[in-house]
Swiss-Prot record:
Note: Hemoglobin A is the major, and hemoglobin D the minor hemoglobin of this species.
A single GO molecular function term of this UniProt record: peroxidase activity
Any one GO BP annotation for this protein: hydrogen peroxide catabolic process
Keyword Transport found: yes
Globin domain sequence ranges: 1-141
Membership in a protein family: Belongs to the globin family.
Binding site for heme b: H87
Tissue expression remark: Red blood cells.
Protein name in the entry: Hemoglobin D subunit alpha
Species this chain originates from: Aldabrachelys gigantea (Aldabra giant tortoise)
Keyword set includes Transcription: no
Pfam families per record: Globin (PF00042)
Annotated keywords: Heme, Iron, Metal-binding, Oxygen transport, Transport
Role, per record: Involved in oxygen transport from the lung to the various peripheral tissues.
Amino acid sequence: MLTEDDKQLIQHVWEKVLEHQEDFGAEALERMFIVYPSTKTYFPHFDLHHDSEQIRHHGKKVVGALGDAVKHIDNLSATLSELSNLHAYNLRVDPVNFKLLSHCFQVVLGAHLGREYTPQVQVAYDKFLAAVSAVLAEKYR
């Protein structure tokens, strides 16, 4: 459960993420493909090389969806419903992959925000991304 303090931290840090959406999203995807190579199977048509236009574009979409979740942090289910449908029914992505990408995104935040990525911010983002992952996995039940 996100506290009001968590929500404030998430929104404050998100202002910094907005300046680097494509870069942070692409880096998180690249990290996921390296650390969890099985995730590449969902992107057979992508050029998976560093800095590929396809990865940058998809990374921007991922971070854009997270931005929508930040804007509507109190209504994640409705905000992410279409995305959940897409991943569950069309793409059939194993829900564990949402957690893997969440972890990689947190690594990117920590690497780029440095001292601003405090333990409190990390806990808030961990809870937020877990909530997003849970909502994206709702349609699988």
